[in-house]
Amino acid sequence: MAGEPDDVDTMVEPVVPSRHRWLAGLLGAGPGDRVADLGCGTGGTLAQAAPAVPGGLVAGLDLSAGALARTAEAVAGAVAGQDRPPGALLVQADLKDPLSLATAGFDRVLCHNVLEVLPDHDALVAEAVRVLRPDGRLVLAHSDFDTLIFASEDLELTRRLVRAYCDTQQPWMDAVDGTIGRRLAEIAGRAGLQVTDVQAQVVLGRRYLPGEIGWGYARNLADTLLGAGRADEAELDRWMAGLQRLHDRGAFLFSVNDSAVICGRMPR
């Protein structure tokens, strides 16, 4: 990928434990399983999955060295004191390139919030299929950024900002496809996979405070659109001040839809 945010603390993923519990549940890994997370970020999902795979392996690939360091800490903390903790393999990798993982080496493979930023979605999915064991499970999951909801004092401005954000390529992205979450089954089908289930969840935030998901997305939206010249500073300041007032009244609300397809190889 073109790059990653310099400061992994600005990422919104780690502050949504419910999302990572959901993803780990979809993987359904068990003792001895080998689990790979392609684009693991700071390790939220691997930390949820690791305790379920004693004697197995959790592998995380990400472009950001800082995120991988956080993943190592998260996984170690999650399995501390376990009799047979899984091994951990963390690899700094650009997911545009072929994966440095063994063919048919993993029982469970996850790709979450990665496909949008790659120019060739199908290439990464093909690599995910390659490293999946014949009876393994692949989970493709993605937020649909066109479903971002902010309670707002200016509905039309919010709609315009969200649409622009959904369609704007950030500097660290090689591509942008903000509605990809609704097309995961199509992508899986092109790879010759059998979709066994489709799931969705709503990620919800009720507070507009640093470290909360609604705050994180609002700030990233503002920085992205200002940097791309798609919104001016005055209207963004006005919009965020309105979000703060809603929070102060107990009326702030944020949500985004996450979709996932659970896949396996077609039976022969």
Residue ranges and their predicted role:
Residues 122-134:
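A short glycine-rich, Lys/Arg-flanked "PGG" loop and its adjoining helix->strand segment in the class I
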Residues 107-121:
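A short SAM/SAH-binding and catalytic strip from SAM-dependent methyltransferases
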Residues 36, 42-98:
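Class I SAM-dependent methyltransferase SAM/SAH-binding core
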Residues 139-208:
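Conserved catalytic/acceptor-binding region of the Class I
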Residues 1-17:
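Class I SAM-dependent methyltransferase Rossmann-like catalytic core
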Residues 14-31, 48:
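Conserved alpha-helix/loop element of class I SAM-dependent methyltransferases that forms part
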Residues 99-109:
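A short acidic, Gly/Pro-enriched loop at the edge of an enzyme's catalytic core
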Residues 2-7, 196-254:
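C-terminal helical/coil "lid" or tail adjacent to the Rossmann-like core of SAM-dependent
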